[in-house]
């Protein structure tokens, strides 16, 4: 049985998303278990936040107390415990948390996996289990194994999308037992800007009304108020593509309809995730707050869909 993100009967469109509390976050994803909400984001050991209502957030510690031992095998230069860009899904009674180990600007990288039976630290079953590496890249590869996102296709088959710069966004089929790449699975490139420096990363795929929507981030994060990050989207009838934007331009040729490029206060929105509860949807991302010297800040906003099935804010 597959549960993507069990948000229960919450109607996202009826909520007031004026977030409060501990909102420092980079590359956030969300899950909900019972009545409690959780955010996982980039930081020491993967940072966790929690909320009783999805609006008021507080820090709740970390997934890993230190860098998992095996990481140095794949990323020898990694000398701190800063883990990047997690993604979480719930499948067959287990939470699967994917995350990235890398150093800035290099593609010597690895995606790791941790599992847990619950997200509630008060539960006696609460324990993050290190499941080791999922897929890695080296300097000789033309892709970068960071920014994981797991998506289940309409037949319930899990896939992993990932990628940052280099040749762009990748997709590979997962084994349903291990939730790691299936034997002989082919690595597919599904989106690329088509020109250097190929500033595309952070894929997130969702399925809605027979279309797969590929959300990505264009341009540059991590520069505070100088960031140029923006969220773009395309869609396909097939999970493997071809993904095209609103104008029919292939995402393999630089296509991507801009969903959000920020404003004077919220600069460089990106690294987004999209969740559904019934017919309602939210967009989760970080943006750099110009009023706080460019601090990366959690954003959750209702995401709407036009008559042609394209998302808008």
Curated annotation (Swiss-Prot):
SUPFAM superfamilies in UniProt: Arabinanase/levansucrase/invertase (SSF75005)
Pfam families tied to this protein: Glyco_hydro_43
Residue numbers binding Ca(2+): 271
GO molecular function: arabinan endo-1,5-alpha-L-arabinosidase activity; metal ion binding
Keyword match Metal-binding: yes
EC number: 3.2.1.99
Catalytic residues as annotated in Swiss-Prot or TrEMBL: 27, 201
Broad class of the protein's primary localization: cytoplasm
Details of cofactor binding: Binds 1 Ca(2+) ion per subunit.
Record site feature (Important for catalytic activity, responsible for pKa modulation of the active site Glu and correct orientation of both the proton donor and substrate), residues: 147
GO biological process, one term: arabinan catabolic process
Pathway participation: Glycan metabolism; L-arabinan degradation
Site (Important for substrate recognition): 271
GO CC, alphabetical: cytoplasm
EC top class, as a word: hydrolase
Temperature dependence: Optimum temperature is 70 degrees Celsius. The enzyme is stable for 30 minutes at temperatures up to 70 degrees Celsius.
Protein task: Involved in the degradation of arabinan and is a key enzyme in the complete degradation of the plant cell wall. Catalyzes the cleavage of endo alpha-(1->5)-L-arabinofuranosyl residues in debranched arabinan.
Note: The N-terminal 16 amino acids plays an important role in the thermostability.
Subunit structure: Monomer.
UniProt-recorded name of the protein: Intracellular endo-alpha-(1->5)-L-arabinanase
Native source species: Geobacillus thermodenitrificans
Gene (UniProt): abn-ts
